[in-house]
Amino acid sequence: KKNCAAISSSLSAKIYKLNILAEQIEDYKNNMTRFYVIGKQKNSISGNDKTSIAFAAKDRVGILYKCLEPFAKNKISLSKIESRPYKNVAWNYVFFIDFFGHIDDPKIQAVLKKLDNYCSFIKYLGSYPVCCDI
């Protein structure tokens, strides 16, 4: 298809007759790459889901604790947390978290409502069935 791209192995490129634009794009020998399927529809609840969100916390003492506390109180496990500098505001950060549960679960909705009290924005990135353990 035109206007499509993929990051894959050279074997996949051969099987699917794809043109290789760049090889060995990793910058770290033992890196792991996350792959996303981007679409316009939400996945329905599978019963074994993860959700990814991004948020910028308001700048206050203890704010990250306040943001994560609702997850802990509701026994929602985080599987990943990363921070990146927020380009629009010096010394502020955007946090990316993955957690177990689906966006349509009322318990998750309640946690995100509490989180919203401490954030300048929250962006839902997706809910998806858990693939496998690495």
What spans do the regions from the language model cover?
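Domain-level signature for soluble enzymes in the chorismate/prephenate branch of the shikimate pathway
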Residues: K1-I134
